[in-house]
From Swiss-Prot:
Domain of life of the organism encoding this protein: Bacteria
Pfam families given in the database record: GlutR_dimer, GlutR_N, Shikimate_DH
Keywords: NADP, Oxidoreductase, Porphyrin biosynthesis
GO molecular function: glutamyl-tRNA reductase activity; NADP binding
Enzyme class: oxidoreductase
Domains as described in the record: Possesses an unusual extended V-shaped dimeric structure with each monomer consisting of three distinct domains arranged along a curved 'spinal' alpha-helix. The N-terminal catalytic domain specifically recognizes the glutamate moiety of the substrate. The second domain is the NADPH-binding domain, and the third C-terminal domain is responsible for dimerization.
Name of this protein: Glutamyl-tRNA reductase
InterPro entries: 4pyrrol_synth_GluRdtase, 4pyrrol_synth_GluRdtase_dimer, 4pyrrol_synth_GluRdtase_N, GluRdtase_CS, GluRdtase_dimer_dom_sf, GluRdtase_N_sf, NAD(P)-bd_dom_sf, Shikm_DH/Glu-tRNA_Rdtase
Length: 467
């Protein structure tokens, strides 16, 4: 069994495609449950953010597992398999591990180096663990990915500027407005992104923040925190959105709603009510939702500037320095190598244990024959013979078992494990019994190349769509 990743992200698809694949928490659970209905998939978890949807699964077979995941996502998104594969990428086994480590480190984010994705990976893993859809393999790789992400952020300056999708978007807004100090802001959505946006706005000394949210209790909690920072804040219902827009210089929307929250009519009414010069006082709307919170037609209105995720990606400030990125990538590469070495060594351990058990069985059988041939042998003599035989066997096996662990830890080392089983006629069933008994953990290793849908792992290129 190996890890299979099927994903679509901002690097492979436009926002319109990501919108079709956007998943809320209940959707993620349903998709994982559907995927796990296949007997060929034993573990699964979904990482869904505003920039990506990725399904990680432990599969018995590459093509069959890929077909299962692709079909489930196709049905959910109402996209044909053909359309979906235009934008999807696939990683298999070692490449899937490397990708998750890279994502957790912020190296694959729209804003390179941002830390929010580390929390998103943590929540995806925690949700899968709570629903008992991860086992030993995904548990190990997810835990390691979180550790790698922390190490990258602590040992490099990749996030020294504290950049995030929110900070970059509001930086663009600040330039457009000639500064944020004293401006009237509207924050739509009181979740994690809304709280992060509010924090940035208070640090920028905006004049007031109107908080709008479906749940008024959450909106009041967020407004209370904003007020504690010294910036006036109040709570509005979504029914009064057009009034809030009419009072605003800046809007940040990040609700996670399945359809636009800010309509063309809402903005039309707000512009009519404002009666202000569009050149001296434009309205800037930061649409950070996925799917989009703002009707795309709003961007065509005079005097309105819409900043979305695609605009954030194009912003120079969204890019970390080359030196920091290189340092982070070196850490990821080293961590991947360490993980895979441990994984391969763990994989050979059941075979080594089975070999030693086979040798012990042979020794015991021969000692039993000795008892039958020399029934008068004194117990002290028998014990000395037994110790001598066991010492000889241990010494004969020591060098080969140490060496096989070393050889098996290198790429392609599984061939040495197979050779050991062949040489000593070790039954695979016996080896599997050792692994499942819990005496030694079994990690999964496999192909090191990335994989293209519809080809074998050994023949594959990196993905459906070049990133």
């Amino acid at each position: 069994m190996s890890i299979l990743l099927f994903g679509v992200s901002h690097r492979s698809a436009p926002v319109s495609v990501l919108e079709q694949l956007s998943l809320d928490r209940s959707d993620q659970i349903k998709i994982v449950d559907r995927v796990l209905q296949s007997p060929l998939v034993t573990e699964a978890m979904v990482l869904s953010t505003c920039n990506r949807v990725e399904v990680y699964a432990v599969v018995e077979a590459f093509h069959a597992g890929l077909s299962v995941i692709g079909q489930v996502l196709s049905e959910y998104s109402a996209m044909s398999i053909g359309d979906l594969t235009k934008y999807a990428y696939v990683r298999y086994s070692e490449a899937a591990v490397e990708h998750l480590f890279t994502v957790a480190s912020g190296l694959d984010s729209a804003v390179v180096g941002e830390q929010q994705v580390l929390g998103q990976v943590r929540r995806a893993y925690a949700a899968a663990e709570a629903n008992r859809t991860v086992g030993q393999v995904l548990h190990e790789v997810a835990q390691r990915a979180l550790s790698v992400g922390k190490r990258v952020h602590s040992e490099t300056a990749i996030d020294a500027a504290g950049v995030s999708v929110v900070s970059v978007a509001l930086g663009i807004a600040g330039r457009t407005l000639g500064g944020l100090a004293g401006r009237i802001a509207v924050v739509i959505g009181a979740g994690a992104m809304g709280a992060l946006s509010s924090s940035y706005l208070t640090q920028a000394n905006v004049g007031r923040i109107h908080v709008l949210n479906r749940s008024l209790s959450r909106a009041r909690r967020l407004a209370g925190k904003i007020g504690e920072s010294g910036v006036p804040a109040d709570v509005w219902t979504l029914n009064h959105l057009d009034e809030a827009l009419a009072d605003a210089d800046l809007v940040v929307s990040c609700t996670g709603a399945v359809s636009p929250v800010v309509s063309l009519a809402d903005v039309h009414h707000a512009l009519a009510a404002m009666r202000r010069d569009e050149t001296t006082r434009p309205l800037v709307i930061c649409d950070l939702g996925m799917p989009r919170d703002v009707d795309p037609a709003v961007a065509k209105l005079p005097g309105v500037w819409v900043v979305d995720v695609e605009g954030v990606q194009r912003e120079p400030s969204a890019r970390a320095s080359a030196a920091d990125v290189d340092a982070a990538r070196r850490i990821v590469a080293a961590e991947v190598a360490t993980y895979l070495t441990r994984q391969r060594m763990a994989e050979v351990a059941p075979t080594v244990t089975a070999l030693r058990q086979r040798a012990a069985d042979v020794v015991e059988a021969e000692l039993l024959r000795l008892d039958h041939r020399l029934p008068g042998l004194e117990s002290a003599q028998r014990e000395e013979v037994a110790r001598t035989v066991r010492r000889v066997v241990d010494k004969l096996l020591h060098a080969p078992t140490v060496r096989i662990k070393q050889l098996a830890s290198a790429p392609g080392g599984d061939s040495y494990t197979e050779a050991l089983r062949e040489l000593f006629e070790l039954d695979q069933t016996a080896v599997d019994a050792v692994a499942t008994a819990g005496e030694l953990p079994v990690m999964v290793s496999g192909f090191s190349d990335t994989t293209r849908y519809g080809t074998s792992p050994a023949q594959s290129s990196s993905k459906y769509h070049a990133e």
